[in-house]
């Protein structure tokens, strides 16, 4: 039985400001979930915090590439150091974000160790890159593209380890059925995508078990689970920067996560995007914590 270690990665460097003169509030995610006693309820060990650099886009303008890139690069390396240490020790890191750019830290850490896959549970694939968009900037919407080697070198080739993820080792779950253009590109790259509709048709548990089994091959050392809170329907999880309709319901997400987290090949989990600034009563934080705790209940 591996030790679960809860580690904070409260970086908001990869999101655009919600309004002029403000910063994204998702950096408070870790504190909000800790207030819901996630560490105690998971019977987890304390992993501390990897403190991020200041959010400061300076004089960045559209066309300048990824904003906060230097800060994200340095933070990715420091976060990777911490995650790598726990993975090599046989722990199971649960990383509390933060925005989705923290996934780069996990991807880099695991690339140092070997060949790992990614099961990304997200409303959108976060696959924006210069080949499909002229609006590059927010790494929180680009981290899977960056992780697979698409984008600027100061983020895609840290330590000369490009790519951190192979296309064939990535799986997406919870993508909205309406995002046809995104799905078409991923299909052309043969990256499997399970939409919300697919999940309901085929069954979350069966899909997750098949995915975990697919990662249990001699060629792959394991996989990481990336959980973006916006995979949930806004009716139950409105506290995200880009709420998209027709998302997963809590029971569906638990059913998807359980077999993934229970797999001996699963190396860890990160939780991102939930914004306490949009959840003044803390109800969404309570729900998200309940989902994660329930998902580990049989793992």
Regions found by a protein language model. Give the residues of each.
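Conserved alpha-helical scaffold segments that buttress catalytic/binding sites
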Residues: 2-299
């Amino acid at each position: 039985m591996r030790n679960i270690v809860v580690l904070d990665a409260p970086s908001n460097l990869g999101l655009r400001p919600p309004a002029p003169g403000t910063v994204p509030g998702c950096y408070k995610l870790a504190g909000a979930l800790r207030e819901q006693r996630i560490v105690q309820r998971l019977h987890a060990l304390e992993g501390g915090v990897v403190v991020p650099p200041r959010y400061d886009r300076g004089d960045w303008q559209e066309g300048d590439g990824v904003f906060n890139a230097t800060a994200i690069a340095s933070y990715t390396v420091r976060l990777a150091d911490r995650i790598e240490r726990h993975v090599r020790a046989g722990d199971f890191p649960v990383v509390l974000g933060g925005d989705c750019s923290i996934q780069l830290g996990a991807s880099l850490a695991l690339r140092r160790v070997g060949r790992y896959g990614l099961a990304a549970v997200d409303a959108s694939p976060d696959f924006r890159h210069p080949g499909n968009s002229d609006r590059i900037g927010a790494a929180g919407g680009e981290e899977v593209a960056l992780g697979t080697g698409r984008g600027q070198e100061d983020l895609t080739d840290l330590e000369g380890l490009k790519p951190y993820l192979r296309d064939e080792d990535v799986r997406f779950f919870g993508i909205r059925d309406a995002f046809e253009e995104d799905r078409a590109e991923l299909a052309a790259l043969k990256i499997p995508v399970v939409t919300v509709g697919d999940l309901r048709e085929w069954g979350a548990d069966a899909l997750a078990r098949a995915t975990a089994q697919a990662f249990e091959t001699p060629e792959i050392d394991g996989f990481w689970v990336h959980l973006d809170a916006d995979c949930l329907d806004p009716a139950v999880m409105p506290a995200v920067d880009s709420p998209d309709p027709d998302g997963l319901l809590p029971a569906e997400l638990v059913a998807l996560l359980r077999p993934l987290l229970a797999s001996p090949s699963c190396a860890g989990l990160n939780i991102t995007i939930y914004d306490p600034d949009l959840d003044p009563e803390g109800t969404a934080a309570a729900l998200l914590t309940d989902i994660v705790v329930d998902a580990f209940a049989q793992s």
